[in-house]
């Protein structure tokens, strides 16, 4: 694996992790030891956002590899090429990590919501299964585990496309349970969040696929980049619009109605993080479009334009991912 590819991956993980921790402290949402007896300790509380981040990164890796096989590296006629088969195997490996994180997240979530040490959850098994968030994580884990097994030896783009549909289905349960109340603005926010998660995963996963497989063929790189540009353009619009709708619904829920949206936006930690995240995504949309348009014509002449394109997008995307996890932890 090229050194710059490793550096890009490690850098993205570090940036996302730092953004998550800094945002949690800045918003006052960092896990705390409440000093109670019999509940989960501080370590378990910190595991929740960290597992969410690991799960998100694994999701991006799985989605990116599948998108690469189905869209970026598409070969006319159906069968996957060498890089396409490699991408499918990578997607299977990422799906295994995603499934493990989902199951571990279910255990940690149950421990926190039921205020029970992990070691004693077996005594409250039925209670844990009754928690919507836990059920959603278990459903996700089962779907993703089936995905990992099913796509392991896929040989055609159509079969890999079915894997994409399963991956999308696995994103829905946890997104749906993020807004359990029934007010109109909460229902709207929940529906928009589902679209937001799918679009964001497609966009970020597409970039991951571009970084991982885009330079496998120097002569094919402009074509791969053009395909990624189309995916990124559609996904970025969907991410922005669905994110704004979801955020508006969440702010209405926090403020008590549509007329009180500005109160939590200007005077709440969630509102501050939301503004930073929106700014990061707007910056990402503008910069990525500018870099792709300027560097596209020079790709065949050298490697620097390619890494200039993905470097900027990776940095801002990793920052936005960390902020997204922090937002999900901010009440």
Language model regions located:
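Polytopic transmembrane helical bundles with strong interfacial aromatic enrichment
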Residues: 1-331
